[in-house]
Amino acid sequence: MKTILVVDDKRVQLKTLRRGLRTRGYQVVEAISGKEALDHLIRDSKIDIVLTDYAMPEMNGIELLQKIREHNKTLPVIIMTAYGDEGLVVEAMHHQCNGFIDKPFDMDELLEEINNIPLR
């Protein structure tokens, strides 16, 4: 069973993603900030994928991606955003983002993005 670290500062979004992913057989670890996500990654080496929102206070999704890449070059990271900005996609890919999904999305779109990532 794959474990996904879901990072979003909106609790409603976390709850929705947790329910959707768990009903499809994934284990879910939640974080409400980039800092909390990094703490989880330090403590739990069993995380298979990071699914993070882009727009968060203190540390956005790309900043989180950069911090992850400083310590782990292979952990898959998918960024979710409501900003359909092509420049944002280019910047994310420059930092070795594995996937990018525009909000709003349905669970099937997210699962397709997750399943397109080869696990380390």
What are these regions (language model features)?
Residues M56:
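Receiver (REC) domain active-site loop signature in two-component systems and cognate sites
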Residues E30-D39, G61:
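Helix N-cap/capping motif at the beta->alpha junctions
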Residues D39, I62-K73:
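Short amphipathic alpha-helix used as the core "switch/output" element in two-component signaling
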Residues R11-V29:
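Two-component/phosphorelay signaling modules centered on CheY-like receiver
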Residues S45-L51:
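Active-site beta3 strand of CheY-like receiver
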Residues G87, F105-N115:
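C-terminal output helix
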Residues E63, G84-G99:
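Alpha4 helix (beta4-alpha4-beta5 surface) of REC/receiver domains from two-component response regulators
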